[in-house]
Amino acid sequence: MTAMRTISEPENLALGSSLPPGDPHGVSVHLPKWADTVGWASRELRVLEAMKTGYPRFFVPRVVDRLATLLLERQKSELGDRGGNEKQAILLNSAQHARLCREALRRLSLPLERGEPPDIGVYIVTWEGRITPVPPEGVTNHPWRARAVGEEDILLVTFPVDIYLAAKAFWQHTGFGVSSRRAAYWLDNAPFLVPDVAPKALTSPAERVKQLNGGLDALKKRIAAGHSSPSDNLLVSLSDVFLFPAGMAAIAQTAAAIKCLRPEDSPSPPRVAVFGFLYVDTNKVLSRVLGYEAVQYHSTPASLDALEADLEASSRATGADPTATSKRLDLLVTEFPGNPLLQAPDLERLGRLARKYGFALVVDDTVGTHANLSLLAHCDVVCTSLTKMFSGACDVMGGSAVLNPASPYRDRLGRALECGRAEAEERAWFWEDVVRMERNSRDFSERVHRASENARRVAGMLRRSESVSEVYYPLGSPTQDWYDRYRKEDGGYGYLLSIKFKTPAQAVAFYDALDVAKGPSLGTNFTLCCAYTLLAHYRELEWAAEYGVVEDLVRISVGLEETGWLEERVGRALMAAEKLDEARG
């Protein structure tokens, strides 16, 4: 297996270590104790100072931070210091990303004390170090010069320090930020950043083009084949597959394209139904960044009934008064299965509602994967975070959106996404990241099947423990029948599971005693555990609990290790939790 890499002795890793260990581009970080997760969530100095890296959307890579600082200093010296040292900056990959960022920051940020809107600057930084300001109307109309692969311009977005949190939220929710590989490449090779150093022997421009195009083509073929379904008479072509620098970027740009399909003179904001408890940033990118009016539904039959009743009421109101469009639904987003509760929605009924009431149905299959499930024939778009099990190596970011060729949205949505394809695939996704993703994913299906079998065994162990109140896993869940409808003949039940212990103390004891890698992300070749709710919803614990996502939930992304290795470590951690139960008794 080309991408199989596990961690044999994770108990020896220190707090803040990169995951994978020693990898400068690792996309997770080790948080060995429950208290470390609390410390990260509460921004405890002890934990922050130990962090060598982190999940790139939650923790700006230090190499990216260094490049942003240098480019901001250059912007100040060349174009004048508007605001002096009170400015900060983030680095984005494309003009479309910069436009969305400027719009979002102005919408999200409260006016500054002087009563003026925040001064958001957008600048094009070339490989040679030229910096050009871009006016608001010019961000999408800039005549981009052809650039050698790897030397594409970077977008520098500057803002007052007092709206840093809004800018950081944009970075986190969208996945539009430059990658650690792009930043390192610039710091090592851009002529204005290393003027006194002899140039390195770089890969030739022709070879970079060959590697980029070859990688993109191979990825599209792999993804298209995985989503094609002869039993559904569904053949996915390469033109139906769109690639992005992150999974959230795939969701953000798909939702933005759907938003663009609305009439320009529509008097109401776009509306999205969020069905089930979805990944933390999906909700936020839809509402906070893209301006959708979001309606949240539980993933239950009763909530599905409520959704249908709302749609019917809106349809009747619109029929009676054609101008009454405020409740019309444009989009419904769901996960199959959900993260972290692994519930499977009734996709067949959602699809019928989508056709009847005229909204787009987008499914995130990151947890289920196209190796286990055939979902595309039953929705309009499937979005995937390729960062997770598709890569598996935990060292590169990427995302995809695949259009159902039989969808009524195929042509219009395809045209909307096609307009930005070159920018998304050839500019925004750095060529070294594309090459890494292609190499990592060659044995994707084999790894999914192995991890799914390991997870099935671990779920069984956990369900037999007296300290465990509930195990959330598709096999044996109340929604297994819905999962099984779309499970491939050789498909399993996935690599992800979550655990609710009988007491919070038992959850802490289990987590602390479990000798595996611990930190954010999922779908890694090595087993990865996290205190999910603390990482994702620390400042909204009560709201999360309303959906069953309790504060002491433990989530495990099961990896490719030998089954005996896993069972021995999970068994020891369960013993630690069970001892607390015995002590109470």
Please tell me what each predicted stretch does:
Residues G26, R43-V47, K200-E207, A416-A509, ...:
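Structural motif of enzymes handling amino- and sulfur-group chemistry
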Residues R569, A573-L580:
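C-terminal alpha-helix
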Residues T2-A249, A257-P263, P270, F275-V295, ...:
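Conserved N-terminal alpha-helix of the aminotransferase class I/II PLP-enzyme fold
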Residues D512-E542:
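Conserved PLP cofactor-binding pocket of PLP-dependent enzymes
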Residues Q480-E489, A531-D552:
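Active-site-adjacent capping/gating segments
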Residues S237-R464, Y472, R584:
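Conserved PLP-enzyme active-site core in the AAT-like
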Residues L216, K220-P245, R316, G460-R463, ...:
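Hydrophobic, structured segments
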